[in-house]
């Protein structure tokens, strides 16, 4: 088939390699395509990058350096998702980026690896791990949410797709896995379907799947469908299916019935499988794409096959839906991006002609609005109409492709149908069907509206218009205007009938809408006339209209000044102002005149409005001097100030402060220059200082930065206004850091009596001059001293303050300051009072009044400096009595006691609160021993050491150091730099330590000597303590320390100390001696303490004398010692000696090392003795196993047999395997036989060439592996009988059959192999593989048995495998039989035709032909029979009649010149009314002069060239042939030619019937004249009745009267008069009923008017309408137009109809 005529159009969109992408990156793992918008390619060389191909601009790929394991572009937007594995983990890091915004949207770290991911919606990512499936939304901050766990059937599968339905309620996961062992090339497909609502999964077998929505007839809600394709093997049979199933059936609603269809794979594609499925919602088609490039197209609704073809020579690995085109994109391994879509022009003709599926063709055309089914649709419509199935016809017309039947003719056809009583008119059925399907066109909308308006159902129109069901037109608006103006306006607007819209708005007085609408549609009305019209009735509406005009694009169509004058002419000041204010908002220079104008008219009439306009500041181009004068006259002084520009004018107006808002005046000062502002302020103060001071102060505060603070201060000082200065500086003070400003403010506040403010500023301010302020306050002598107290307290003038207050007798303030303000400064106050010689009683009282709040230390210092410390005795004692623990209190009291020498030792030793360091320092020069007491009490180490060194008090120092037991203190006094160290050590050794009874003090001293690294002094010390009989002579630790110190400092003394001392830690000291390499001393220590193992270890490990160790072991005779000796001997390689020592030690713990060493030394005899000893100690499998192995090595097989019969824990299996590996087969045989390991025993017997025994053992083992090993060994040894026994047990296993067959065949044992397989057929477990393999062997080596075999066992064969074998061996008959059995009818037919001498059989071929799927094979079969078996061709054609394109068959036979050969076939299929068949048969009938058959053919089948046949027949010599020609002319509507031909042959009856059927009055009357001319009176009478409806009565009567044939015309006249009178009676009756209805309606209207007039007095009087705008709207009809009446439609009810044909014959 030519590509242009194919139903599916293919094109290459682009090639990835042409964009610079290397071929190695065109793979499933590197390329992703989530939609038709983007392709994303991940490159890893020469550098890591991601290439994004925008399908709208494929030549401009975007390449970004990104490292990732996978990259996905969002289906709709430029959002990129990246996945990368975290190094060293199995976790994946996911990120989502917005490429356009260059921002990261979100990221997440998955705890497990994501093996597949996909955008399932534009907002949702599907993540598939090894165990579960997650959904991750790109919106918000949510993490991936788990949806479900993967089912078991998807374990170890490669996931290739994941999808969800549009509602996200159904999810499907697709994976593939390696094929079954018998057919590994055919990949398995597995599917998991999950329901979100039910939280359940279903596992299915499928390679590809997709979701679809489909509307089932009778259900308004769409059904969710799942489609999936699978290719599976079952018992060697391959099944390829497509399934369409509804998910979640809707209760109570019609459901979608399950569909399935076969996928027919060509022979060369048997291992091909589906990799993708896409569904076109646009066309309702399913696309199934396979790996090798096959495309299957199926109908979604019926699952009917539409098309199959190969679209790519290279494997396809990726597809994506193309929703815009209704097709899909596919990418193959070559890098081609292929685009497939439906060929709109050819698919419907293809389905109707090639597939002969007319119903599907019509459904496709209706579904997707496609061409090609016009004739079918029209024909079907006519059939339905003829069958009065009006509802079905209406539905067909509504769904007709491309609106084929949506024409006025169709409407007229429905209108013409008579309406039966009680039934819905067909026309309304038609319109109702159209409304449910969509929108009506203009003609349909108009006709439906006529019906609705006539029935007064306006609400239906409103609903349809709201739902956009009607197409609006001007005619429709005119129709609706008769009942509803508002609705008509909406229709006019939608129909863009601009003049009608403007007229309607004008009638409604919605003038603003006129402007909006005119602008939208580009229409220009008369604006000035409209504005004048609105002004008369609606001033505000006129303003709005004018404003809308001003906002029009291109400027206002009427001048602003003209519009303003129109308002002012009618004294509409406010309206003119409103208009001008709005249009003058842009504040343009060209509007200066209008700005001045609006201000003038309002300053004269409405000053407040003018003031508001000026306040808004919206104008800046008006005449300011003119406006200033008008403002002053109107009393708007502030506005006048703002507009005057001369200083005199400003001064003149400004003094009117009574009429100016103070705040506004202050703001006005901000517009003046500095000099003018100061002049105006001065004038204001001159005119009214008291009244204007507040305004001047406010202005000065507001604009102090511009005017200058100094200038303002000078202004107020000039008028001596301290009040003004106070208020001005008060506002400026918080932001100023100028000391002078702060001082002036304090001064002004003091002058104005603001004492509290002075107190506040002196307390809070940090910027005034303290000295200057203090002097001012002292000079001012304010009654309140608190400001002075603040200054002096804050700035350290406390003595001056105290002196001022004391000299001014303000003692109350002194007490207040000390007690309340700052008690901390009381010492300074006391010191100044002492300097001022204040009485001590006042000072003591002042001190006692503060008590604990008083800081003692500075007070003591102040008194101590003045030698008045005793003054505080009472105060200090008072504090102590109150329980004070203040160190300063007790220090001062101690100093007083020391100075008075009042038992100071008692105070120093008993008082816990004084500071030892302070008091000790105070005592150093007075009495050093008191200082030592103080320092000892406070542990003041440094001070005590210094004072004792300085005064040579080393004995006290030594005692203190020993008693302190402080390591840091010892370190300090024992430092080499200490010049007094020797004196201290002497006192410690001679006095301090001998006096001490505390072990801790001794220990601390010893530790200090060790830390100071004084070993000799330490030995001296320890010898004195330990060796001389002291309290510590037997001290364990000291003896240890003495020996250890000697080891370190003087090793020669160690052996003496070891012999003299007994109470020391022998093991520990011995280890230290070993570390110090004093091995003999260590040996002596261990020996002294009976530590024999440690002692022998010293001999072995340190002294390295095995002989001394062995002697020592004999002496002590301990097992542990012998064990150490044995281990040493083992290390030295003395294996036999070591084994003997281990036996002496009775030590079985090191048997592993002994076994390893014995095996290396090959001393199995000694090992046996050792292992027997070990077995007495331990029950270890290793020991028993090694014992057996040792017996085997020394060939003691009988011992092995005895041993295994005894209780043992040996792992005999492992032992046997080891013996087998070491080729000790006899021993292994004993073990395997004992443990009944028949499999190993069989193999072992094979090694020993004992085949019969091996077979017996294999039988007991019953293992496939064992059987194979024994079998192959028997084959190699040519023991075929035994080999067959084994083989029969192997071939029942499918997986092992092929291996056995190959083994036999490789060694040329064909007969034996066939014998084996034949024997296998009778086995109970015989399977398909045995039968198949035997068939293959027959095909190769015994072809004469092949056919019998496949016929006997056809159901138990793997037919595809046998097909390949027969094809290879060219067994065509058998091959054909196999194809038939496998339902591969295409291949069977091809084989029969290609190898007919061997394979053809007519009955068989007929059976095959009807099942062939490839249409081309039908015609190949026709050619085949035509060439080889022409006598049987009709039989074949009759069988294939339903599948053939009859036109093509006829063409084949016509070209071959054998049409007559297939006449029976053509007769059989003529019922299909195919043009080629009809013409061929007609041709044969003419040729055979068979007019009866020809007439029957012409009458029943009209699809042929009628005129051509008629022209051919009208000259035929046979009359019947010419009658047929006339008949054809009549059917074709060529009435004159038909009549002329009938006249010529005197066939008058035919003439009359032709006239009657033509409906042509002229022809009928001409025929009457012809009969009169020919004198055929009887024919004249017959013609009158046959053409009754066409002949006018006057014509008939005239012709009869003139030609004396009235008698022959009389029956016609009687019938005519009877019918005429009946019609008149009916009309009279209808007229009377109509008049009665009119009278009743008039009466109802009168009653209604009377009822309405009851409330007439409540209605307001009607207002007179302006000229041209009043009165009812003019009628829409044109003058002279007759009334429309019933809108040109006949009445819908049934009416009398004329009789057709002959009238009834009345009695004469």
From Swiss-Prot:
GO BP annotation list: intracellular protein transport; receptor-mediated endocytosis
Keyword rRNA-binding: no
CHCR repeat residue numbers: 551-697, 700-842, 847-986, 993-1138, 1142-1283, 1288-1434, 1437-1580
The protein's name: Clathrin heavy chain 2
Binding site for the uncoating ATPase, involved in lattice disassembly: annotated span: 462-478
UniProt cross-references to PANTHER family, sorted A to Z: CLATHRIN HEAVY CHAIN (PTHR10292:SF1), CLATHRIN HEAVY CHAIN RELATED (PTHR10292)
WD40-like repeat 5 as annotated region, ranges: 206-270
GO molecular function terms attached to this record: clathrin light chain binding; structural molecule activity
Protein family membership: Belongs to the clathrin heavy chain family.
Annotated region described as Involved in binding clathrin light chain, given as residue ranges: 1227-1536
Proximal segment, as annotated region: 653-1708
Region of interest (WD40-like repeat 1), ranges: 25-67
Record text on subunit structure and interactions: Clathrin triskelions, composed of 3 heavy chains and 3 light chains, are the basic subunits of the clathrin coat.
Region WD40-like repeat 2, residue ranges: 68-113
Region (WD40-like repeat 7) location: 315-343
Region (WD40-like repeat 3): 114-155
């Amino acid at each position: 088939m030519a590509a242009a005529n194919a139903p599916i159009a293919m094109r290459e969109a682009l090639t990835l390699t042409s964009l610079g992408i290397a071929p190695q990156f065109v793979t499933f793992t590197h390329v992703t395509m989530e939609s038709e918008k983007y392709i994303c390619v991940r490159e890893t060389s020469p550098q890591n990058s991601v290439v994004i191909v925008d399908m709208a601009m494929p030549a401009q790929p975007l390449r970004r350096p990104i490292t990732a394991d996978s990259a996905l572009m969002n289906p709709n937007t430029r959002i990129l998702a990246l996945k990368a594995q975290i190094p060293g983990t199995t976790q994946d890091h996911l990120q989502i980026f917005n490429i356009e915004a260059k921002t990261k949207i979100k990221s997440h770290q998955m705890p497990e690896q994501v093996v597949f991911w996909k955008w399932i919606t534009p907002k949702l990512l599907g993540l598939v791990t090894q165990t579960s499936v997650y959904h991750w939304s790109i919106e918000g901050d949510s993490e991936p949410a788990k949806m479900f766990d993967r089912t078991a059937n998807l374990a170890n599968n490669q996931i290739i797709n994941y999808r969800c339905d549009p509602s996200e309620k159904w999810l499907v996961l697709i994976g593939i896995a390696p094929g079954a062992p018998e057919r590994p090339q055919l990949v398995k497909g597995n599917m998991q379907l999950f329901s979100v609502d039910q939280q359940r999964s279903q596992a299915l077998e499928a390679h590809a799947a997709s979701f679809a929505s489909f509307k089932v007839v009778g259900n308004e809600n769409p059904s969710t469908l799942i489609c999936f394709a699978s290719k599976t093997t079952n018992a060697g049979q391959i099944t390829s299916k497509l399934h369409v199933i509804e998910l979640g059936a809707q209760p109570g609603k019609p459901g979608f019935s399950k569909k399935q269809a076969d996928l027919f794979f060509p022979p060369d594609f048997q291992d091909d499988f589906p990799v993708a499925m896409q569904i076109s919602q646009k066309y309702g088609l399913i696309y199934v794409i396979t790996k090798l490039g096959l495309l299957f197209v199926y109908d979604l609704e019926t699952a009917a096959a539409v098309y199959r073809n190969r679209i790519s020579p290279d494997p396809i690995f990726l597809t994506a839906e193309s929703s815009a085109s209704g097709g899909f994109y596919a990418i193959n391994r070559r890098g081609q991006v292929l685009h497939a879509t439906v060929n709109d022009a050819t698919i419907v003709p293809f389905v109707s002609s090639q597939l002969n599926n007319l119903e599907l063709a019509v459904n496709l055309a209706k579904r997707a609005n496609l061409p090609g089914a016009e004739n079918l649709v029209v024909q079907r419509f006519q059939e339905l109409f003829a069958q009065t199935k009006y509802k079905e016809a209406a539905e067909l017309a509504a769904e007709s492709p491309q609106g084929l039947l949506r024409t006025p003719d169709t409407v007229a056809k429905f209108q013409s149908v008579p309406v039966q009583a009680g039934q819905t008119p067909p026309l309304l059925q038609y319109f109702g069907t159209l409304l449910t399907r969509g929108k009506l066109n203009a003609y349909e909308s108009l006709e439906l509206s006529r019906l609705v308006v006539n029935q007064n159902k306006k609400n239906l129109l409103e609903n349809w218009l709201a739902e956009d069901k009607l197409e609006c037109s001007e005619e429709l608006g005119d129709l609706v205007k008769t009942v509803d103006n508002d609705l008509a306006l909406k229709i006019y607007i939608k129909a863009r009938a601009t003049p009608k819209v403007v007229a309607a708005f004008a009638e409604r007085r919605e003038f603003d809408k006129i402007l909006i609408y005119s602008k939208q549609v580009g229409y220009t009305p008369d604006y000035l006339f409209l504005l004048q019209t609105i002004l008369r009735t609606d001033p505000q509406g006129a303003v709005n209209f004018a404003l809308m005009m001003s906002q029009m694009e291109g400027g206002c169509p009427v001048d602003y000044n003209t519009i303003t004058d129109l308002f002012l002419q009618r004294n509409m000041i406010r309206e003119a102002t409103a208009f001008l204010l709005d249009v003058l908002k842009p504040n343009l220079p060209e509007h200066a005149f209008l700005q001045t104008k609006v201000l003038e008219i309002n300053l004269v009439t409405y000053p407040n409005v003018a003031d508001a306009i000026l306040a808004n500041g919206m104008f800046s181009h008006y005449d300011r001097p003119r406006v200033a004068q008008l403002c002053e006259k109107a009393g708007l002084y502030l506005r006048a100030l703002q507009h005057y520009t001369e200083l005199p004018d400003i001064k003149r107006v400004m003094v009117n402060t009574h009429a100016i808002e103070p705040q506004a005046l202050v703001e006005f000062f901000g517009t003046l220059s500095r000099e003018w502002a100061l002049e105006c302020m001065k004038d204001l103060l001159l005119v009214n200082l008291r009244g204007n001071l507040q305004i001047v102060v406010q202005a000065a505060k507001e604009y102090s930065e511009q005017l200058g603070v100094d200038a303002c201060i000078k202004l107020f000082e000039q008028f001596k206004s301290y009040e003004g200065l106070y208020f001005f500086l008060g506002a400026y003070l918080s932001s100023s850091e100028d000391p002078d400003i702060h001082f002036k403010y304090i001064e002004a506040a003091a002058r104005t009596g603001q004492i509290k403010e002075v107190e506040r500023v002196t307390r809070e301010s940090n910027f005034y001059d303290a000295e200057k302020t203090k002097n001012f306050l002292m000079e001012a002598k304010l009654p309140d001293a608190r400001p002075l107290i603040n200054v002096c307290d804050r700035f350290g003038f406390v003595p001056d303050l105290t002196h001022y207050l004391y000299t001014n007798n303000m003692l109350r303030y002194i007490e207040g300051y000390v007690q309340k303000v700052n008690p901390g400064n009381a010492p300074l106050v006391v010191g100044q009072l002492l300097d001022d010689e204040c009485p001590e009683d006042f000072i003591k009282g002042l001190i006692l009044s503060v008590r604990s709040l008083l800081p003692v230390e500075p007070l003591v210092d102040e008194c101590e400096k003045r030698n008045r410390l005793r003054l505080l005795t009472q105060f200090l004692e008072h504090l102590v009595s109150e329980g004070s623990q203040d160190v300063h209190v007790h220090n001062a009291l101690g100093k007083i006691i020391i100075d008075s020498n009042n038992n100071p030792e008692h105070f120093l030793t008993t008082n816990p609160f004084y500071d030892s360091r302070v008091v000790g320092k105070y005592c150093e020069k007075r009495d050093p021993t008191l200082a030592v007491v103080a320092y000892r009490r406070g542990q003041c180490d440094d001070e005590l050491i210094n004072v004792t060194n300085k005064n040579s008090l080393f004995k006290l120092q030594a005692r203190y150091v020993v008693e302190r037991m402080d390591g840091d203190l010892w370190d300090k006094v024992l430092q080499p730099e200490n010049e007094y160290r020797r004196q201290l050590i002497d006192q410690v050794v001679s006095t301090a330590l001998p006096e001490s009874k505390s072990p801790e003090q001794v220990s601390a001293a010893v530790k200090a000597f060790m830390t100071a690294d004084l070993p000799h002094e330490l030995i001296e010390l320890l010898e004195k303590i330990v060796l001389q009989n002291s309290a510590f002579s037997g001290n364990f630790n000291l003896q240890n320390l003495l020996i250890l110190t000697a080891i370190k400092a003087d090793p020669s003394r160690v052996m003496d100390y070891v012999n003299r001392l007994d109470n020391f830690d022998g093991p520990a000291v011995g280890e230290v001696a070993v570390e110090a390499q004093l091995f003999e001393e260590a040996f002596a220590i261990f020996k002294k303490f009976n530590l024999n193992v440690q002692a022998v270890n010293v001999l072995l490990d340190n002294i390295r004398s095995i002989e001394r160790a062995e002697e020592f072991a004999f002496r002590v005779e301990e097992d542990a010692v012998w064990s150490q000796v044995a281990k040493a001997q083992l290390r030295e390689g003395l294996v036999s000696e070591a084994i003997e020592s281990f036996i002496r030690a009775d030590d079985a713990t090191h048997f592993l090392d002994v076994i390893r060493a014995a095996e290396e030394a090959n001393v199995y005899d000694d090992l046996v003795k050792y292992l027997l000893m070990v077995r007495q100690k331990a029950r270890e499998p290793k020991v028993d196993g090694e014992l057996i192995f040792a017996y085997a090595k020394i060939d003691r097989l009988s011992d092995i047999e005895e041993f295994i019969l005894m209780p043992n824990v040996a792992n005999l299996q492992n032992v046997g395997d080891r013996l087998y590996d070491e080729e000790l087969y006899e021993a292994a045989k004993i073990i395997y036989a004992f443990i009944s390991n028949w499999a190993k025993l069989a193999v072992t017997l094979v090694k020993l060439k004992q085949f019969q025994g091996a077979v017996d053992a294999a039988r007991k083992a019953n293992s496939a592996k064992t059987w194979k090993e024994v079998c192959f060994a028997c084959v190699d040894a040519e023991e075929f009988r035994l080999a067959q026994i084994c083989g029969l047990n192997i071939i029942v296993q499918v997986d092992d059959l092929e291996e056995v067959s190959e083994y036999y065949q490789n060694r040329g044992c064909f007969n034996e192999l066939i014998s084996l397989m034949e024997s296998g057929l009778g086995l109970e477990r015989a399977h398909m593989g045995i039968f198949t393999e035997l068939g293959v062997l027959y095909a190769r080596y015994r072809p004469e048995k092949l056919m019998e075999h496949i016929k006997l066992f056809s159901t138990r064969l793997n037919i595809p495998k046998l097909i390949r074998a027969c094809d290879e061996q060219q067994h065509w008959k058998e091959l054909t039989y196999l194809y038939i059995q496998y339902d591969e009818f295409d291949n069977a037919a091809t084989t029969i035709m290609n190898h007919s001498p061997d394979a053809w059989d007519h009955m068989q071929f007929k059976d095959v032909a009807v099942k062939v799927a490839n249409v081309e094979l039908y015609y190949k079969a026709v050619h085949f029979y035509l060439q080889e078996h022409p006598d049987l061709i009709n039989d074949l054609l009759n069988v294939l009649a339903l599948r053939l394109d009859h036109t093509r068959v006829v063409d084949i036979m016509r070209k071959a010149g054998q049409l007559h050969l297939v006449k029976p076939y053509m007769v059989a299929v003529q019922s299909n009314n195919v043009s080629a068949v009809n013409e061929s048969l007609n041709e044969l009938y003419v040729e055979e002069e068979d007019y009866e058959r020809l007439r029957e053919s012409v009458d029943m089948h009209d699809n042929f060239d009628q005129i051509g046949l008629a022209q051919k027949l009208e000259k035929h010599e046979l009359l019947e042939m010419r009658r047929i020609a006339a008949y054809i002319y009549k059917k074709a509507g060529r009435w004159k030619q038909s009549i002329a031909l009938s006249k010529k042959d005197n066939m008058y009856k035919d003439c009359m019937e032709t006239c009657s059927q033509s409906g042509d009055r002229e022809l009928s009357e001409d025929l009457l004249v012809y009969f009169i001319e020919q004198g055929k009176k009887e024919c004249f009478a017959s013609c009158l009745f046959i053409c009754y409806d066409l002949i006018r009565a006057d014509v008939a009567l005239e012709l009869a009267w003139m030609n004396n044939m009235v008698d022959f015309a009389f029956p016609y006249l009687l019938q005519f008069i009877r019918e005429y009178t009946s019609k008149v009676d009916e009309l009279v009756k209808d007229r009377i009923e109509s008049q009665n209805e009119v009278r009743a309606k008039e009466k109802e209207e009168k009653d209604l008017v009377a009822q309405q007039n009851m409330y007439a007095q409540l209605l307001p009087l009607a207002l007179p309408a302006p000229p041209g705008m009043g009165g009812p709207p003019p009628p829409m009809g044109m003058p002279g137009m007759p009334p429309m009446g019933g809108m040109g439609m006949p009445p819908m009810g049934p009416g009398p109809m004329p009789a057709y044909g002959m009238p009834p014959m009345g009695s004469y």
